[in-house]
């Protein structure tokens, strides 16, 4: 038997099948570096509970713009050869609700409908303590993180994901990658987008068809719909959240194997959501916000997602070291996959 390990520069580097399907994508998200950050949960909770950050920003907290330099960096990161340096968690849906414990903390029912994965206690009042005490749908059970995305609809009927896989990948400064700190919160994507070009973190395609789109494709019989969502790879090293829920994070520069900007010097694994739905054809839409109102008719290019880290710290650190730093593709148990 042998293990799957990262191929070195002299070796051919084929794309893994899951990424080959999305090989037509030519854009990826780079988070704008902005000022004004919050270092602790209590401050964020207090602002949200008093109608501060959550009430003022609402879903405007998801909006962003890309500079030409950042677009170029994103393109380089997306198109560079993908190395075998990752681990994963499979986290079936635990249900849906109109809550968003990052953007609209303490306001149950205020958000458009989200599909929640991972921690079984996630609601509008979720904090790190409740996640630590909760259960999880994830394999491995060491991952008690909360993950969520807008609910998908077909002809007005909510669709439960068939599968949800969360990849943790070593793309930026792999030798120095650090685990995400417990309590880290990240939002990625743009629910206020008016075109696919305004939301390059998200993409859709049909299983088995090597093309990707910012909006819903029409999947033929025999296929099904899937979506990818990419998270940033660099942390500022200080703040577990920020007022816009993104400025404490940034994407690495220089493509795969590149480095973090000085403003965000700590490389972390890139999260990539891979969500599959057993649907095809037309009539697709997302839960979202349009003209200030929650709707179920938002277009595919408004897809976005949230991550609230509650991994067991020792297990996450082990996987980062044994899989990402050491250059292996690992399974759900955090061990190199045998073939």
Describe each model-derived feature in a short phrase.
Residues 1-45:
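Secretory targeting and sorting signals
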Residues 31, 40-42, 102-105, 233:
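Generic hydrophobic/packing signal
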Residues 42-54:
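Ser/Thr/Pro/Gly-rich low-complexity linker/stalk segments immediately outside membranes or between
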Residues 51-111, 115-229, 236-339:
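Primary mode marks residue(s) on the alpha4-beta5-alpha5 output face of response regulator receiver
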């Amino acid at each position: 038997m042998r293990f799957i390990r990262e191929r070195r520069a002299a070796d051919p580097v084929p794309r893994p099948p899951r990424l080959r399907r999305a090989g037509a994508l030519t854009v990826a998200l780079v988070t704008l570096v902005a000022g004004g950050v919050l270092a602790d949960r209590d401050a964020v909770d207090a602002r949200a509970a008093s109608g501060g950050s959550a009430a003022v920003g609402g879903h405007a907290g998801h909006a962003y713009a890309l500079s030409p330099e950042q677009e170029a960096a994103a393109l380089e990161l997306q198109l560079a050869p993908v190395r075998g340096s990752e681990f994963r968690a499979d986290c079936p849906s635990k249900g849906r609700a109109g809550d968003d414990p990052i953007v609209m903390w303490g306001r149950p029912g205020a958000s458009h409908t989200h599909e929640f994965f991972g921690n079984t206690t996630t609601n509008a009042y979720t904090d790190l303590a409740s996640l630590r005490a909760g259960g999880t749908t994830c394999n491995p059970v060491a991952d008690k993180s909360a993950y969520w995305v807008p609910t998908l609809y077909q002809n007005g009927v909510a669709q439960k994901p068939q599968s949800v896989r969360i990849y943790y990948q070593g793309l930026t400064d792999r030798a120095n990658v650090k685990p995400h700190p417990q309590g880290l919160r990240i939002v990625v994507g743009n629910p206020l987008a008016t075109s696919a070009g305004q939301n390059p973190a998200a993409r859709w395609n049909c299983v088995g068809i090597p093309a990707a789109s910012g909006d819903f494709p029409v999947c033929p019989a025999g296929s099904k719909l899937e979506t990818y969502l990419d998270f940033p790879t660099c942390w500022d090293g200080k703040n577990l959240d920020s007022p816009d829920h993104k400025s404490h994070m940034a994407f690495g520069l220089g493509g795969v194997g590149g480095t973090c900007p000085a403003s965000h010097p700590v490389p972390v694994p890139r999260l990539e959501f891979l969500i599959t739905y057993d649907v095809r054809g037309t009539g697709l839409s997302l839960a979202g916000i349009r003209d200030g109102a929650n709707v179920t008719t938002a277009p595919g290019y408004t897809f976005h997602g949230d991550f609230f880290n509650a991994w067991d710290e020792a297990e996450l650190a082990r996987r980062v070291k044994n899989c990402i730093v050491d250059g292996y593709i690992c399974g759900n148990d955090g061990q190199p996959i045998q073939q």
